[in-house]
């Protein structure tokens, strides 16, 4: 059976009685074949990341110095709100993309970003900051999730790890550069409004690129579904209920559920770094410029190293990169507590970034390995629900522990959780990607 005949048999749109030659040719999957749209989506994702980077150097200090938030748990409330909203939005973003098309969800996400910098600039109370982070969480959940899924759609199974490495490189390098820029601007002009003018430009450009230039990837999803079904001798239209996908991603499937817990702990670390590190460094009498550099080093290392780790997972597999990466993160956090001073903390921040880079794109690639194209968006949404709940869990846990026992104790507790997560991956997660098997296909 030829590809076009299989397409005609399995695609409802092709069952119209039209001759086989009249059926449009399916798009070709691959990074090289779709490099223009892939590069555009990387650029869009960079602007998505830059929106988060606006807050990483400045907002914890803003809460303490301008709004007089007395407790660390209160200061970290903006991270918890962001994480909770983003996690829930991730869940629906994948399902909405599967049902209504990826581009529509991407554009909608950018619309929620437009008011965010204005709310922070004009905020008379901390409640306005919380509202801004609710909108930012929706923006990130819709826009970043959809950009990830669209890249998975474009490249197909063989280069998925490299694709995720490139995607997260663009996003988190932008997070780092934005955090550095806002911190430097704040050190010269004040904590607001000047640092947040950048956000107005980021949101406007990201929206314009998404509306004008991004194309939907529905046909690429259909092409991969047909190819997988042809290889398996099954129907390409097989669907799985949301409840079933949620169960697989939460407890039933060892690969998907173990990836979900690792993602949650990974972002618990990131929530800690976002909300607590600037205050931890400030308490050690570091300058705002030094704090900006430290908040830059972690996501910058994370972003750059992902260029190698994503592709490396395509060659060596996913499991052990994830397990070792989680353990390295735990060791780096322990170093933050054991060491003191700008240079030792810089080394720990770099190590934390390397560990995160080993994990972050590899987890997404593992989800893509296991999930079928027809329910891939939903599976990514379930994974990102649990992963980004880590922001909320991390902010609450770190805030409560820091108020009760001090910031160093909070960081140490999270380091222990991270090491345990790496052990769980080593013991429970199966290998999801066997390069030699793909090469033989």
Model features per residue range: what roles?
Residues 111-124, 328-340:
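C-terminal ends and interior cores of transmembrane alpha-helices
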Residues 15-35, 218-259, 441:
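Juxtamembrane intracellular "pre-TM" segments in multi-pass secondary transporters
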Residues 132-172, 366:
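Cytoplasmic helix-loop-helix junction between adjacent transmembrane helices
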Residues 83-91, 176, 299-307, 391-392:
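Residue-level signature of mid-helix packing/kink "hotspots" within the transmembrane helices
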Residues 32-83, 257-258, 262, 266-284:
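Helix-loop boundary and gating motifs at the non-cytosolic
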Residues 89-101, 186, 305-317, 402:
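Helix-to-loop junctions at the C-terminal end of transmembrane segments
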Residues 194-211, 411-426:
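Symmetry-related core transmembrane helices of the 12-TM Major Facilitator Superfamily/SLC fold
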């Amino acid at each position: 059976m030829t590809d076009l005949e299989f397409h005609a048999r399995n695609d409802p749109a092709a069952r119209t009685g039209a001759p086989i030659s009249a059926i449009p040719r399916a798009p070709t999957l691959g990074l090289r074949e779709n490099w223009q749209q892939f590069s555009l989506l990387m650029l869009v994702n960079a602007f998505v990341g830059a929106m988060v980077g606006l807050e990483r150097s400045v907002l914890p200090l803003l809460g303490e110095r301008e709004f007089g938030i007395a407790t660390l748990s209160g200061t970290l409330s903006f991270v918890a709100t962001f994480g909770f909203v983003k996690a829930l939005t991730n869940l629906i973003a994948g399902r909405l993309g599967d049902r209504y098309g990826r581009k529509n969800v991407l554009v909608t996400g950018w619309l929620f970003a437009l008011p965010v910098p204005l709310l922070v600039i004009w905020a008379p109370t901390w409640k306005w900051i919380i509202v801004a982070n609710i909108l930012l969480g929706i923006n990130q959940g819709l826009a970043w999730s959809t950009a990830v899924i669209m890249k998975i759609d474009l490249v197909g199974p063989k280069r998925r790890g490299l694709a995720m490495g490139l995607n997260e490189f663009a996003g988190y390098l932008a997070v780092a550069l934005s955090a550095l820029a806002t911190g430097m601007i704040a050190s010269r002009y004040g904590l607001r409004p000047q640092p947040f003018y950048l956000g107005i430009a980021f949101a406007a450009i990201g929206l314009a690129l998404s509306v004008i230039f991004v194309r939907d990837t529905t046909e690429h999803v259909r092409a991969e579904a047909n190819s997988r079904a042809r290889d398996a001798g099954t129907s390409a239209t097989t669907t799985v209920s949301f409840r079933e996908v949620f169960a697989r991603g939460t407890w039933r499937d060892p690969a998907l559920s173990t990836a979900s817990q690792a993602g949650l702990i990974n972002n618990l670390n990131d929530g800690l770094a976002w909300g607590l590190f600037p205050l931890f460094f400030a308490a050690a009498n570091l300058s705002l410029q030094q704090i900006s550099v430290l908040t830059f080093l972690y996501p910058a290392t994370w972003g750059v190293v992902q260029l190698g780790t994503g592709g490396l997972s395509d060659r060596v597999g996913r499991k052990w990169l994830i397990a070792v990466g989680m353990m390295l993160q735990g060791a780096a956090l322990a170093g933050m507590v054991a060491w003191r001073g700008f240079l030792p903390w810089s080394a720990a921040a770099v190590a934390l970034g390397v560990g995160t880079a080993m994990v972050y794109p590899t987890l997404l690639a593992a989800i893509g390995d296991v999930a079928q194209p027809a329910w891939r968006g939903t599976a990514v949404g379930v994974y990102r629900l649990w992963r980004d709940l880590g922001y909320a869990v991390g902010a609450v846990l770190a805030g409560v522990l820091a108020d009760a026992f001090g910031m160093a104790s909070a960081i140490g507790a999270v380091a222990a959780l991270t090491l345990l997560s790496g052990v769980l991956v080593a013991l429970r997660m199966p290998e999801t990607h066997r390069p030699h098997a793909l090469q033989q296909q």
